[in-house]
Amino acid sequence: MDFATAFAGLAERGEREATAPLGGVDVRLVRVPAGGEGRWDSHPDTTETVVVWSGEFKVEFRDRTLLLTGGQCCVVPVGAEHRGTSPTGAEVVLFTKGRA
């Protein structure tokens, strides 16, 4: 999967996100606008790996916040409540266990 090409395609189509299966993993590409705030979420049976492709992205947990920039990543533990926000806009790749 070519992330640069995929994000460019999303931008050209005016879309914010796309999800594709890849080797048993769901890969979700998200273009987060400046000031964008996601909803609180949790995953009861899988971790979620968050990779920031570009920009600044905050992964907020109930008890702490991680600020990530392009090229950085973190893993959201199974069951952890979290949400993503971006003060300046970001392109983010999310990896979770694929749906059976």
Give residue spans per PLM region:
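Short, conserved beta-strand element in jelly-roll/cupin
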Residues: 42-59
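Conserved hydrophobic/aromatic positions in well-ordered beta-strands
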Residues: 28-30, 50, 93
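Short histidine-centered beta-strand/loop micro-motifs
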Residues: 18-21, 38-44, 61, 85-86
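Short acidic-glycine-tyrosine-enriched beta hairpin
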Residues: 63-78
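Structural motif
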Residues: 56-58, 65, 81, 91
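Ligand-binding loop in jelly-roll beta-barrel domains
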Residues: 78-100
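A short, N-terminal "cap"/entry segment at the start of jelly-roll beta-barrel domains
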Residues: 1-33, 39-40
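A cytosolic small-molecule/anion-sensing beta-strand core signal
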Residues: 53-54, 69-70, 88
